[in-house]
Amino acid sequence: MAAPAPSLISVFSSPQELGASLAQLVAQRAASCLEGDRGRFALGLSGGSLVSMLARDLPAAAAPAGPASFARWTLGFCDERLVPFDHAESTYGLYRTHLLSKLPIPDSQVLTINPALPVEDAAEDYARKLRQALQGDAVPVFDLLILGVGPDGHTCSLFPDHPLLQEREKIVAPISDSPKPPPQRVTLTLPVLNAAQSIIFVATGEGKAAVLKRILEDKEGTLPAALVQPRTGALCWFLDEAAARLLSVPFEKHSTL
């Protein structure tokens, strides 16, 4: 089943239907990129509920392309907690367990932090890996970033009123005072987010409704998620009905049934 063409805001009746359409869209984007001039697909993932959502639906959605296609995928992470990979808070660790065991992406194509390094060094090391893997642009360009948004409006590990929102030189930044535990993390910065070819924000549940109204309807442009405005790429929001319940702005209602 083909995913719906994304509008600015797409609303689904349940997280399950959202996840199925998201997986189809990732697979379609991958196929398009692999047929393009660069012949590769660079995907940036966020953690949280996205892990289980993608683990459930992406392997089947991407399977028709065949195992060989995954050798040309490059997978990165939009932010990461500075914890060992077997820690429950490790975003890579969760994807390794639940998704990467089902997708034959070579380990060399999965870009991770080195959690044994101090946070500043871990950020620099991850930035080097990104530049090496995504060569050809002054700022590394992902073909697709999948982002979440917190009830406070944060995305990645970019939090409201934090100095990292002003970072323009680094492509990956360390953070040692995260308002959410664990405190030490590394995160992509706004210049990298806004260089992406496509960005999908995913939000589900009533707990996200108020902040989505602030971003999408009240246009509170200082919230971190609102600062994600791709320079030339596409931006869309995938929401379930609970997350969208306070919105009166136009959106497209989708169903995979």
From Swiss-Prot:
Locations listed in the record: Cytoplasm
InterPro entries tied to this protein: 6-phosphogluconolactonase_DevB, Glc/Gal-6P_isomerase, NagB/RpiA_transferase-like, PGLS
Keywords: Acetylation, Cytoplasm, Hydrolase, Phosphoprotein
Enzyme Commission number(s) of this protein: 3.1.1.31
Record's catalysed reaction(s): 6-phospho-D-glucono-1,5-lactone + H2O = 6-phospho-D-gluconate + H(+)
Protein's UniProt keywords contain Cytoplasm: yes
Pathway in which this enzyme or protein is active: Carbohydrate degradation; pentose phosphate pathway; D-ribulose 5-phosphate from D-glucose 6-phosphate (oxidative stage): step 2/3
Chain positions found as N-acetylalanine: A2
Broad enzyme group: hydrolase
Pfam families: Glucosamine_iso
GO biological process entries: carbohydrate metabolic process; pentose-phosphate shunt, oxidative branch
CDD domains cross-referenced by the UniProt entry: 6PGL
Residue numbers carrying N6-acetyllysine: K180
Positions bearing Phosphoserine: S49
Stretch forming the signal peptide: none
GO CC term, one of those recorded: cytoplasm
PANTHER family: 6-PHOSPHOGLUCONOLACTONASE
Entry's family note: Belongs to the glucosamine/galactosamine-6-phosphate isomerase family. 6-phosphogluconolactonase subfamily.
Function: Hydrolysis of 6-phosphogluconolactone to 6-phosphogluconate.
Protein name per its UniProtKB record: 6-phosphogluconolactonase
Record organism: Mus musculus
